[in-house]
Amino acid sequence: DESATSGLPLLMNLGRARPHTHLALTGGSIGLGLPLAIGAAIAAPDRKVVCPHGDGGAAYTVQALWTMVRENLDITVVIYANRSYAILNIELQRVGAIGAGPKALSMLDLHKPEMNWVQIANGFGMEASRATTCEEFVAQYDSAMKSRGPRLIEVMC
């Protein structure tokens, strides 16, 4: 789980999960979610792995999507596409960097160019879809849970 700024609802529902069901970012960096999902899928091939991930952090280790396809791992990646390094904006505030200029703020914005996670995943040979509504996400997620193999769902935030 590397959904640092989008995953709070998920965390609130994991209190009763069995041990080692939720592997999370422990702080200090971003980008480990996709490789962590690979490790979980290799360690427990009989269990489906769901990897909730922010779009900014996923860009750090995007090549992991290729490994998921190459090894035919049963991983569903859910990308929260908020088009921002949102956690880094929060960290700027935490350290008192008030009034960051437009250039600094633009470095944390993921709009220029905009990442299209469906096309990125397809480029690695991975099935992918985009959800723009809750209903679309539920349908795509249900479909992913009923099938084996790697898949990516881009959720537009």
Labelled PLM ranges:
Residues 1-41:
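Active-site diphosphate/adenylate-binding microenvironment
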Residues 1-3, 23-24, 51, 130, ...:
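General beta-strand structural signal in soluble alpha/beta enzymes
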Residues 6-7, 59, 133-137:
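Short acidic loop-to-helix transition motifs that present clustered carboxylates
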Residues 9-15, 35, 62-65, 87-92:
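Short acidic, glycine/serine/threonine-rich loops at helix termini
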Residues 29-31, 58-59, 83-87:
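Short gly/pro/ser/thr-enriched loop/turn and capping motifs at secondary-structure boundaries
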Residues 46-60, 75-80:
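A short, small-residue-rich loop immediately preceding and capping a beta-strand
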Residues 71-157:
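Thiamine diphosphate
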